[in-house]
Amino acid sequence: MKCYLVVVVAALCTLVAQGSVGAPIPKPNPIEDIYASQLPDPGTTAQMAAGDSAYPLTLLASFDPNDTSALH
């Protein structure tokens, strides 16, 4: 009985392996199928004003990589 179980499990494993290898691979759409209307409109993207760069520069200037005060 144990021999039959081994044969059945081996046959099922073979069928599962063949099924997974033989599965069709979906074909992606070529780049020609992307139209200009699907791309984001550059007018709707957020743009930083020139004066807004002062705050990130202040954060960068106050950043100390050797600061270990948060570790204590």
From Swiss-Prot:
Interacts at the cell wall with secreted rep1 repellent peptides. It comes from the Eukaryota. Keywords: Cell wall, Glycoprotein, Secreted, Signal, Virulence. This is Late effector protein 1. The keyword Secreted applies. Glycans are attached at N66. Belongs to the lep1 family. Residues 1-22 form the signal peptide. Core effector contributing to spore formation and tumor formation at the host plant. Modulates surface hydrophobicity promoting cell-cell or cell-surface contacts. Lep1 and rep1 interact in aerial hyphae to form a strong hydrophobic layer. Plays a crucial role in hyphal aggregation that might be a prerequisite for strong proliferation of diploid cells and for induction of the morphological changes associated with spore formation. It is found in: Secreted; Secreted, Cell wall. It comes from Sporisorium reilianum (strain SRZ2).
